[in-house]
């Protein structure tokens, strides 16, 4: 395993640990999710380029589309929650309330 793959795996792991440990604010959770998506994109792109898989070359682009949709939905949810409740604490949110 080359050092670039190890760096991307460590970036994914650190983002996952950040999501698990620092989930008090919604903004920090969204940033950790974006870090995970970025490291997955770079890893998939490097693997596809190194193995010369031409049929799978659209998969990183599809992942970026899903990451952009996730970011847009997350930011709109963050704006809605912060204007409604005045805070973005994840622990104080109860999504089952009307």
Curated annotation (Swiss-Prot):
Enzyme Commission identifier(s): 7.1.1.2
One Gene Ontology CC term in the entry: mitochondrial inner membrane
Subcellular localization: Mitochondrion inner membrane
Chief localisation class: mitochondrion
Alphabetical list of Pfam families matching this protein: Oxidored_q2
Domain of life of the native organism: Eukaryota
GO BP, sorted A to Z: ATP synthesis coupled electron transport
The family this protein is said to belong to: Belongs to the complex I subunit 4L family.
GO MF terms held by the record: NADH dehydrogenase (ubiquinone) activity
Membrane topology: Multi-pass membrane protein
Residues that span the membrane, as ranges: 1-21, 29-49, 61-81
Protein name as annotated: NADH-ubiquinone oxidoreductase chain 4L
Reactions mediated catalytically: a ubiquinone + NADH + 5 H(+)(in) = a ubiquinol + NAD(+) + 4 H(+)(out)
Subunit structure: Core subunit of respiratory chain NADH dehydrogenase (Complex I) which is composed of 45 different subunits.
Enzyme class: translocase
Matches recorded under Gene3D superfamilies: 1.10.287.3510
General function of this protein: Core subunit of the mitochondrial membrane respiratory chain NADH dehydrogenase (Complex I) which catalyzes electron transfer from NADH through the respiratory chain, using ubiquinone as an electron acceptor. Part of the enzyme membrane arm which is embedded in the lipid bilayer and involved in proton translocation.
């Amino acid at each position: 395993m080359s050092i670039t793959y190890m760096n991307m795996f460590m970036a994914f792991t650190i983002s996952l640990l950040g999501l698990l440990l620092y989930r008090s604010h919604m903004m920090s959770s969204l940033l950790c999710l974006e870090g995970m998506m970025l490291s997955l994109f770079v890893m998939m792109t490097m693997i596809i380029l190194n193995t010369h898989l031409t049929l799978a070359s659209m998969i990183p682009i599809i992942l970026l589309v899903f990451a952009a949709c996730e970011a847009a939905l997350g930011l709109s949810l963050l704006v809605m929650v912060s204007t409604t409740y005045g805070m973005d604490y994840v622990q104080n949110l109860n999504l089952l309330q009307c």
